[in-house]
UniProtKB/Swiss-Prot annotation:
Name the UniProt record assigns to this protein: Arabinan endo-1,5-alpha-L-arabinosidase C
GO biological process, one term: xylan catabolic process
Protein family (similarity comment): Belongs to the glycosyl hydrolase 43 family.
Taxonomic lineage: Eukaryota, Fungi, Dikarya, Ascomycota, Pezizomycotina
Known catalytic reactions: Endohydrolysis of (1->5)-alpha-arabinofuranosidic linkages in (1->5)-arabinans
Length: 320
């Protein structure tokens, strides 16, 4: 398998994707959340596993160090997955001077899932857990994991979803509660295969709301590798409203036509990039961050690497 993967990655290098930016120190990462602290610009990244693993550095390139867990011992949510939390998403509210972390509580292959929320004044370990914000049911059409907060048209919106009926949005009343009568609205879907689309992330730039998401299979690369090209890749769509009508660069709907323009896929020593987000760095501009597997290091989730690239822009579309 390793020889076949190496040949595939070599051929994929012709796609002209840039290699990840430099990373030193502890560069492990999985489904990273990311924030540059408001007070001093220090970088923090948060990863799937246990009570959410936290790494910190004064520089984006590192050296990165593990500093602890956001919720040691897990979440207060009553669920089988409460001690192995997934997919953290971080944002800051100036009105409360607090950082908010949305996290996922679930088990593989299940729609019995919960999005929880926790707060911190400084991004350091030992956050205050506020428990469940939203829950999906085992027989439902959507999966309450992979949450992302965004201000859309001045209102707080939670984007979430994985597989099944794809990516959805929910209006919030505030960072700790849903809006009255809130129901999920579907914004992106992949009708093919097992509907492998997840990790939606919305950001705003110059009149457009951009939706990035991960398409393809996320893991088991070491024990049950997917067919060539079916591993994770990062795609993008955009919308003027931010709450629907997302299309890709060719104009295909990302809800009804399986749209999505690939901005990063396997190449070189980068395999299965995904679990992504975007932030505006104080000096570099817009930066895409994600995890990936480096075959020279290993393909298991415990060997995933943190990756980042400065986004380039042409005609209102990002690339790396």
């Amino acid at each position: 398998m390793k020889l076949a993967l190496s040949l595939f990655l070599l051929s994929g290098s012709l796609a002209q994707y840039s290699n990840p930016g430099a990373c030193s120190g502890d560069c492990w990462g999985h489904d990273p959340g990311f924030y540059q602290r408001v007070s001093d610009g220090r970088y923090y990244r948060f990863s799937t596993g246990g009570g959410i693993q936290i790494h910190a550095s004064d520089n984006l390139e590192g050296p990165w160090e593990a500093v602890g867990e956001a919720l040691p011992g897990g979440s207060v949510v009553d669920h089988a997955g409460s001690t192995n939390l997934w997919a953290p998403d971080i944002h800051y509210e100036a009105s409360t001077n607090l950082y908010y972390m949305y996290y996922s509580v679930s088990t593989l292959g299940s729609r019995d899932s919960v999005i929880g929320v926790a707060t911190s004044p400084n991004l350091q370990p030992n956050w205050t857990d506020h428990g469940a914000l939203f829950r999906s049911q085992a027989g439902g059409n959507y999966n309450a994991i992979d949450a992302n907060w965004a201000s859309i048209g001045g209102s707080p919106i939670l984007t979430f979803g994985s597989y099944w009926n794809g990516i959805h949005q929910l209006p919030l009343a505030g960072p700790l509660s849903l809006a009255d009568g809130a129901t999920p609205t579907q914004i992106a879907y992949n009708s093919s295969g097992n509907h492998a689309i997840e990790a939606g992330f919305v950001f705003y730039r110059r009149g457009w709301y951009y939706l990035t998401f991960s398409s393809g299979r996320a893991g088991s690369y070491d024990t049950n590798p997917p067919a060539t090209g079916e591993e994770y890749r990062i795609v993008v769509c955009r919308s003027a409203s931010g709450t629907g009508d997302f299309v890709d660069k060719s104009g295909r709907s990302c809800l009804t036509d399986n749209g999505g323009t690939t901005i990063l896929a396997s190449h070189g020593n980068v395999y299965g990039p995904g679990g992504q987000g975007v932030f505006e760095d104080r000096t570099r501009g817009w930066v895409l961050y994600y995890h990936y597997a480096n075959p020279d290091i290993g393909l298991s989730t415990g060997q995933y690497q943190f990756g980042w690239n400065v986004l380039q822009w042409a005609d209102g579309w990002p690339s790396v």
